[in-house]
Amino acid sequence: MDKVELEFYFFMKGQAGSFTTNLFKTIMSADFGNQYKLSFGFPDEVSVVQKYKNEDGYWENLLNKFDNPESV
């Protein structure tokens, strides 16, 4: 699991810091055009949110990687 995925995990669990929380909330609420603009400064964070929104099973796989690291 990379650093951004770990930050996203903590965000989703309500345990992220204020900057990370506000960043992910902003990315998640942005339309495609604004996500594109945000990706210039935060490419990995935007990528994780897009995977979460568009890839079936992404969140479940992320949970599995965090909760069962030996199984990955």
Model segments located where?
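Long acidic/polar interaction regions in large eukaryotic complex-forming proteins
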Residues: G57-V72
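N-terminal acidic leader/helix
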Residues: M1-A30
